[in-house]
A protein has these predicted regions:
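Signature of N-terminal electron-transfer/Fe-S-associated modules in redox systems
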Residues: 1-157
Length: 157
């Protein structure tokens, strides 16, 4: 049995220890916000926070999270997370929406470490997150909007 903290709650899993965390989240724990994209940690759809850092759940064995803290999109209850969700809607980022939870999780780690990122900071931090709808300009715009909202400015200005 593997025990860990998930979205602030103590949980355990009896899945085989080499089971990718993504499948434990989706199949056993019924948290389907974290998506399967590529299965090789190249697209970012499966991004979660592990001890506060972005991590790819599709290649992470269950045993790697034992006694650690993880957050999924369902549990992202931070100022950065709230600002990003509002900005995502205001900037009309989603098209198909498949990559969005991973994009938001990755962007949240940026804003939690750097509340006023430059364009190059955003591009560098978001590198490796694929969006098949090519919404990259809107994603970048939403991250800037979330940054402004976190500093007290209004969305859409």
């Amino acid at each position: 049995m593997v025990r860990f903290t998930l979205n602030g709650q103590s949980v355990s899993s009896n899945s085989p220890v080499d089971t990718p965390l993504l499948w434990v989240l989706r199949e056993e724990l019924k948290l389907t916000g974290t998506k399967f994209g590529c299965g090789i940690a190249q697209c970012g759809a499966c991004t979660i926070h592990l001890d506060g850092s972005a991590a790819r759940a599709c290649v992470m064995p269950l045993t790697a999270v034992e006694n650690r803290s993880e957050t999924t999109i369902e549990g992202l209850a931070t100022p950065a997370g709230a600002a990003l969700v509002s900005a995502w809607e205001a900037e009309q980022v989603p098209q198909c929406g498949y990559c969005q939870s991973g994009q938001i999780m990755q962007a949240a780690t940026l804003l939690e470490k750097n509340a006023q990122p430059s364009e190059s900071d955003i591009v560098s931090h978001m590198d490796g997150h694929l969006c098949r709808c090519m919404a990259y300009p809107r994603i970048k715009k939403a991250i800037f909007a979330a940054s402004r909202a976190m500093s007290g400015e209004m969305l859409g200005e």
